[in-house]
């Protein structure tokens, strides 16, 4: 098992850039449609819940509900963009298009490919999260400088969720299995992590579950930054996101090597 992990590591510190660039060049042809697609869902939540439910809710934690919600949607947009890129587009490149098979005939290793795919998913997550943030800043729900401070956390959020989704990609026999991850993990996480309402409104048992969810850690950093509130336990939240980004990377890489190169 140890040899499997070692063999799955990236060959060096730069091969992954070629994988990232390949994905970027392919994406550039459909960039506008891709960006609009990633923004549509969070914007519907933002204006649908924010404008409609916000009239009944009023203020939450001292700010308007739509301002509270906008910060949650920034993190959620990063989560969904990186997750869908990894479980669908990455799986297509690995299985249907057989792009990985062609790449593996070069000096690039499985680890290089996975690292490049994760970096690309984090890039798309950054674009999606920043897009929602730009809308929020334009409408006055956050300051522009606050959005700039939030960008590294948005990117880290994308990297963490891409890394987690890569495990699903490594194990899934076909596209149909991804619906289980979407409905049983991603969707519940949206409502349990404080994206649409405060976590302290949840029952006690659910609040304990929330503490281990990566989206909750992301929101607990992004929301205070965007709303100008004090940051609490920021080191813990960033450390948790780093763990979610790093540990699944090694696990998924080993699983993919065993799957593709038995």
Swiss-Prot record:
Residues 33-259 form the ABC transmembrane type-2 domain. Part of the ABC transporter complex NodIJ involved in the export of the nodulation factors (Nod factors), the bacterial signal molecules that induce symbiosis and subsequent nodulation induction. Nod factors are LCO (lipo-chitin oligosaccharide), a modified beta-1,4-linked N-acetylglucosamine oligosaccharide. This subunit encodes the transporter. Keywords: Cell inner membrane, Cell membrane, Membrane, Nodulation, Plasmid, Transmembrane, Transmembrane helix, Transport. This is Nodulation protein J. It comes from Rhizobium meliloti (strain 1021) (Ensifer meliloti). It is a multi-pass membrane protein. InterPro entries: ABC2_TM, ABC2_TM_bact-type, ABC_2_transport, ABC_transptNodJ, Nod_factor_ABC_transporter. Pfam families: ABC2_membrane (PF01061). It comes from the Bacteria. GO terms for biological process: oligosaccharide transport. Disulfide bonds: none annotated. The complex is composed of two ATP-binding proteins (NodI) and two transmembrane proteins (NodJ). Belongs to the ABC-2 integral membrane protein family. Lipooligosaccharide exporter (TC 3.A.1.102) subfamily. Coiled coil: none annotated.
């Amino acid at each position: 098992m140890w040899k499997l992990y070692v063999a799955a590591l990236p060959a060096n510190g730069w091969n992954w850039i070629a994988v990232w660039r390949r994905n970027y060049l392919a994406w550039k042809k459909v960039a506008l449609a891709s960006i609009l697609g990633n923004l549509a869902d969070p914007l519907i939540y933002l204006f649908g819940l924010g404008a409609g439910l916000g009239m009944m809710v009023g203020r939450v934690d001292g700010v308007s509900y739509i301002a509270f919600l906008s910060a949650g949607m920034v993190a959620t947009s990063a989560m969904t963009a990186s997750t869908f890129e990894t479980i669908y587009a990455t799986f297509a490149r690995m299985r249907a298009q057989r792009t990985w098979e062609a790449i593996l005939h070069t000096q690039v290793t499985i680890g290089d490919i996975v690292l490049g795919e994760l970096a690309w998913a984090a890039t798309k997550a950054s674009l999606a999260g920043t897009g929602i943030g730009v809308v929020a800043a334009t409408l006055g729900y956050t300051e522009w400088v606050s959005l700039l401070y939030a960008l590294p956390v948005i990117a880290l959020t994308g990297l963490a969720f891409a890394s987690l989704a890569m495990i699903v990609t490594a194990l899934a026999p076909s596209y149909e299995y991804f619906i289980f991850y979407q409905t049983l993990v991603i969707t519940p996480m949206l409502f349990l992590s404080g994206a649409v309402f405060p976590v302290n409104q949840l029952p006690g048992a659910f609040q304990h579950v929330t503490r281990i969810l990566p989206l909750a850690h992301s929101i607990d950093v992004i929301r205070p930054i965007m709303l100008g509130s004090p940051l609490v336990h920021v080191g813990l939240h960033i450390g948790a996101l780093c763990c979610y980004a790093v540990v699944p990377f090694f696990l998924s890489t080993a699983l993919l090597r065993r799957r593709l190169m038995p």
